[in-house]
Amino acid sequence: MENGLNITSEIGKLQTVLVKRPGSELENITPEYLESLLFDDIPYLKMMQKEHDFFVKTMQDSNIEVLYLEKLAAEALKEASNKENFLTKMIKESNQMDESALYVRDYLMSFDEEEMIKKLMSGLKKSEIPERKKKHLNEMMDEQYPFFLDPLPNLYFTRDPAAVIGSGVTINKMFQPARRRESLFIELILKHHPRFSSQEIPIWSGREEPFPLEGGDELILNEETVLVGVSERTDARAVERLAESLFSRAPKIKRVLAAEIPETRSFMHLDTVFTMVNFAQFTIHPAIQNQQGELNVYILEKSENGLEITPRRDFKRVIAEVLGVPEVDFIPCGGEDVIVSAREQWNDGANTLAIAPGEVITYDRNHVSNDLLRKAGIKVHEVISSELSRGRGGPRCMTMPITRGNLK
């Protein structure tokens, strides 16, 4: 863990985690742009912040170090030798070109680092910048659109833009255009923040990759096995490229499992339907399996000729095999009632955050799932969630673990 990163499981004692406190980016959501910004409703920011603060305190009460993305990004920007390069990349990926790009960049350069990061995250409205004469057709035709830079309201889901695997990281190419710029902040922090920049950090998969990969689909089962969901947001080709990278550069990784889940918004990532809660216990949304309990899973392993891929259907058996245990316990999200199960999964009942073996943080609203976890011997910390859940993500979604203790 010389470079400050260490994740060898989903359940090792959580030591350091990265979060983003919901901010003014949420107040730049309007009904007209809900769909493009990936929201179903407009959250109430003041309550959302109270809920997030409660969540953070719950972690801190368990002696977890909580780092804030916005703070680290501003500190990293202070260390960066050329702020204009970072801004240019951010503006280009916001589809601003020609004079507009220069105009926006010059405006943002007038702020200190904290305010600049805040504006990049919250979005830059056209009304914030003094009026100028428009020279180009595209500018004139786009006059009604309110933003130079779109807000990033999904940024409080720090799980997805990047994921630590071992002592390296994937800096992810996000599937949805509304989220593409998010991983630029992670890239900035790892390159320029003093906490990370002094050591070499392997990048297993970079944001320039051709196929999307998101952290909600990346689960670290143990130091030898990574489980990746092939989902609405992660492409099978990205999983294959990640496996090739890990096998060539991360000697402890022996296999990558690819689990195929339905490509729907409600199951957008693997961690919305399946999370690890203890050594051989998982919570699962029953609807991702067929009536026989089967799910397509592919075992990717290194071979003399490149990759060897073995298709399987017995998902539960495969998980037990790679963990080296006789069997595993799958705890159904919402229980056996299909109505309760669907409702609680929609509100992230399966999206648990393990902070130690057999100890998790969950949303309080999913009382059936929480009761089932407790009956299975899991210690459950419930956090308030009426507004946080509107973004369609739970406690695991809202965290990027930086370090965990290794399992014995």
UniProtKB/Swiss-Prot annotation:
The keyword Iron does not apply. GO terms for molecular function: arginine deiminase activity. GO terms for cellular component: cytoplasm. One of its GO terms (biological process) is arginine catabolic process to ornithine. It catalyses: L-arginine + H2O = L-citrulline + NH4(+). Transmembrane segments: none annotated. Pathway: Amino-acid degradation; L-arginine degradation via ADI pathway; carbamoyl phosphate from L-arginine: step 1/2. Keywords: Arginine metabolism, Cytoplasm, Hydrolase. Its EC number is 3.5.3.6. The active site is at 397 (amidino-cysteine intermediate). It is found in: Cytoplasm. Gene3D superfamilies: Arginine deiminase (1.10.3930.10), L-arginine/glycine Amidinotransferase, Chain A (3.75.10.10). Belongs to the arginine deiminase family. This is Arginine deiminase. It comes from Listeria innocua serovar 6a (strain ATCC BAA-680 / CLIP 11262). The lineage of its organism: Bacteria, Bacillati, Bacillota, Bacilli, Bacillales. The gene is arcA.
